Amino acid sequence: MAEQVFQNFETLQLHAGYTPDPHTRSTAVPIYATSSYTFNDSAHGARLFGLKELGNIYSRLMNPTVDVFEKRIAALEGGIAAAATSSGQAAQFLTIATLAKAGDNIVASSHLYGGTYNQLNVLFPRFGIKTKFVRSGKLEDYVAAIDDQTRAIYVESMSNPDYVVPDFEGIAKIAHEHGIPLVVDNTLGAGGYYIRPIEHGADIVVHSATKWIGGHGTTIGGVIVDSGRFNWNKHSDRFPEMVEPSPSYHGLKYWEAFGPATFITRIRVEMLRDIGACLSPFSAQQLLLGIETLGLRAERHAQNTEKLAKYFESSPNVSWVLWPGSESHPTYAQAKKYLTRGFGAMLSIGVKGDASAGSKVVDGLKLVSNLANVGDAKSLAIHPWSTTHEQLSEDERLASGVTEDMIRISVGIEHVDDIIADFEQSFQKAYGA
């Protein structure tokens, strides 16, 4: 697919970013299992290393198989380019490390995945980068948190595990008025199927590709997508590294050389070069296989999740249901506005009782797997209080939307009647009714 003529998601997931090799005519994307690439001559190698010419040098920076994956995700999300990473946490780390340095800060929603919260709250302060967490969804609280050292606003498209959908357009407006980018973790957006944050003002999108993009629980990976819309030159006071001469490349000026692709270029030629958190071609091929059925799976995931949510709402063993498609959800209006192809593939419930009751229900499941992943074709459940958010303090867990009685469920594509039956038998064992 040399030129992106077709724009529909279901077509892009199969064709974007790849044209059959002219020699082999392989219809499937080959796995280029190579560490490095030959140069035409020494002058060619010098041009590549000096970024005067773009091309393959070393697979830590770029690889033909990984390149197809990157182009495909960029097309699905509506970005100009993408960079793949070894995991979602790596994608997040490299993004923030590119935007901020010691003395800077990030403003972030407190409604975050536990691993993300820890990275922002514990790891980055070791490098001198602090995070100001906004516990409410109020726009004025985001404004109040921003200062001269703020380098980005960070939110999740649907927070994990309480599925808060932020006011993207409102937050993006605030970010841009202050000369900073909006970064959105769109992992729960399923590769752009449920929502494309860039269409609503996001400047940078990150994913754990391990989840719905891969879709089968086989492969760890991440990806960063650049919208190409943020004007780094206009805001050079906050981001001098984007416009001033780079000591890494003999005074090269990124904005002058790469324009709208400045950010994603720095991710590739500095962060992947120096940190090394790259995606292997084998992992890229597995993720590409997953992408080919992403739209089909996401549609079924959303249908099953809605039916399961309605079952839980009528269950005497469930105190509450958190699902963004429910009118009782605090951000239902925003979910209805932004999620145009279904309300996602996850929900959380509060079971009658305390933490021990939640663990008992999860332990009693037979079909639904008890594990820490989400976004698998198979249904998964976990007790976040004692697992994914266990490293947080009690106050931090509550601020993240995690309670003792919560069970987080990633709804698979099995027949929904069997998923319901599994919870029913577990409830009977746990409660005797």
Curated annotation (Swiss-Prot):
Q: Which cofactor does the UniProt annotation name?
A: pyridoxal 5'-phosphate
Concerning biotechnological or industrial application, the UniProt entry reports: Fusaric acid is phytotoxic to plants such as cotton and banana. It has been shown to induce programmed cell death in plants. In addition to a mild toxicity to animals, fusaric acid exhibits acanthamoebicidal, antioomycete, and antimycobacterial activities.
Cross-referenced InterPro entries:
Cys/Met-Metab_PyrdxlP-dep_enz (IPR000277), Cys_met_metab_PP (IPR054542), OAc-hSer/O-AcSer_sulfhydrylase (IPR006235), PyrdxlP-dep_Trfase (IPR015424), PyrdxlP-dep_Trfase_major (IPR015421), PyrdxlP-dep_Trfase_small (IPR015422)
Induction of the gene: Expression is positively regulated by the secondary metabolism regulator LAE1.
Q: Does the keyword Cell cycle apply?
A: no
- Function recorded in the entry: Sulfhydrylase; part of the gene cluster that mediates the biosynthesis of fusaric acid, a mycotoxin with low to moderate toxicity to animals and humans, but with high phytotoxic properties. L-aspartate is suggested as fusaric acid amino acid precursor that is activated and further processed to O-acetyl-L-homoserine by cluster enzymes aspartate kinase FUB3 and homoserine O-acetyltransferase FUB5, as well as enzymes of the primary metabolism.
Pfam families (alphabetical):
Cys_Met_Meta_PP
Instruction: Point out the coiled-coil segments of this chain.
Output: none
Carrying N6-(pyridoxal phosphate)lysine, the residues are: K211
What is the enzyme's main class? transferase
Q: What is this protein called?
A: Sulfhydrylase FUB7
GO biological-process terms attached to the record: cysteine biosynthetic process from serine; L-homocysteine biosynthetic process; transsulfuration
Query: Has UniProt tagged this entry with the keyword Glycoprotein?
Result: no
Q: What is its EC number?
A: 2.5.1.-
Keywords per UniProt: Pyridoxal phosphate, Transferase
Name the CDD domains for this protein.
CGS_like
One GO molecular function term of this record is: cysteine synthase activity
Q: What pathway, per the record?
A: Mycotoxin biosynthesis
The family annotation for this protein states:
Belongs to the trans-sulfuration enzymes family.
